[in-house]
Amino acid sequence: YSPALNKMFCQLAKTCPVYLRISSPPPPGTRVRAMAIYKKSEFMTEVVRRCPHHERCSDSSDGLAPPQHLIRVEGNLRAEYLDDRNTLRHSVVVPYEPPEVGSDCTTIHYNFMCNSSCMGGMNRRPILTIITLEDSSGNLLGRNSFEVRVCACPGRDRRTEEENFRKKEEPCPEPPPRSTKRVLSSNTSSSPPQKEDPLDGEYFTLH
């Protein structure tokens, strides 16, 4: 996980623990929902799903999860896999469990079952995973999100993206003053070269 990017880098089908910390105990019957959406506005209405190849590769180890669902919960038989009637978006819901003794976080283990680069699936389009805390009636109690990239080399990709992000945040250095040769003349005058303003740096705010 990269705090600077608010982005998780992981491998396909590998365990990804997500830690939930809440300010006060929620009411009985509270549930935790995880849903993936496309980050860019032009793709937001599309459902994030596995590519046809990984869908076909599903086997009995998938358990309760439908083959087209990208996000799965590991080690929880109470997980429910749902398709929204209106948006058709996929989500997985588990009952909220309080933190274990000595911890202030609830841990849920997720798996992401398709690579970000898969054709016919995410196809290199960035996704957000949205985690919501809901009461038994479906009312929203809390929400958070982070970007996810599923790839073969998470460590390498994280370092590359963090370096690119830092470069974009740094303002461009001011160019050195130009050295010019002038011919002295009694009847001409020359004005000094105008100083160039440094380019403004680009800043990105992650929500």
From Swiss-Prot:
Binding note for cofactor: Binds 1 zinc ion per subunit.
Compositionally biased tracts (Polar residues): 182-193
Record-listed N6-lactoyllysine modification sites: 14
Residue ranges annotated as motif Bipartite nuclear localization signal: 181-197
Keywords recorded for this protein, A-Z: Acetylation, Activator, Apoptosis, Biological rhythms, Cell cycle, Cytoplasm, Cytoskeleton, DNA-binding, Endoplasmic reticulum, Isopeptide bond, Metal-binding, Mitochondrion, Necrosis, Nucleus, Phosphoprotein, Repressor, Transcription, Transcription regulation, Tumor suppressor, Ubl conjugation, Zinc
Residues with N6-acetyllysine modification: 181
GO molecular function: DNA-binding transcription factor activity, RNA polymerase II-specific; metal ion binding; molecular condensate scaffold activity; promoter-specific chromatin binding; RNA polymerase II cis-regulatory region sequence-specific DNA binding
Stretch list, region Oligomerization: 201-207
Post-translational modification: Phosphorylated by VRK1, which may prevent the interaction with MDM2. Phosphorylated by CHEK2 in response to DNA damage, which prevents ubiquitination by MDM2. Phosphorylated by PLK3 in response to reactive oxygen species (ROS), promoting p53/TP53-mediated apoptosis. Probably phosphorylated on by CDK7 in a CAK complex in response to DNA damage. Phosphorylated by CK2 following UV but not gamma irradiation.
Residues in cross-link Glycyl lysine isopeptide (Lys-Gly) (interchain with G-Cter in ubiquitin): 167-168
Purpose: Multifunctional transcription factor that induces cell cycle arrest, DNA repair or apoptosis upon binding to its target DNA sequence. Acts as a tumor suppressor in many tumor types; induces growth arrest or apoptosis depending on the physiological circumstances and cell type. Negatively regulates cell division by controlling expression of a set of genes required for this process. One of the activated genes is an inhibitor of cyclin-dependent kinases. Apoptosis induction seems to be mediated either by stimulation of BAX and FAS antigen expression, or by repression of Bcl-2 expression.
Subunit structure, interactors included: Forms homodimers and homotetramers. Binds DNA as a homotetramer. Interacts with AXIN1. Probably part of a complex consisting of TP53, HIPK2 and AXIN1. Interacts with histone acetyltransferases EP300 and methyltransferases HRMT1L2 and CARM1, and recruits them to promoters. Interacts (via C-terminus) with TAF1; when TAF1 is part of the TFIID complex. Interacts with ING4; this interaction may be indirect. Found in a complex with CABLES1 and TP73. Interacts with HIPK1, HIPK2, and TP53INP1. Interacts with WWOX. Interacts with USP7 and SYVN1. Interacts with HSP90AB1.
Protein name: Cellular tumor antigen p53
Gene (UniProt): TP53
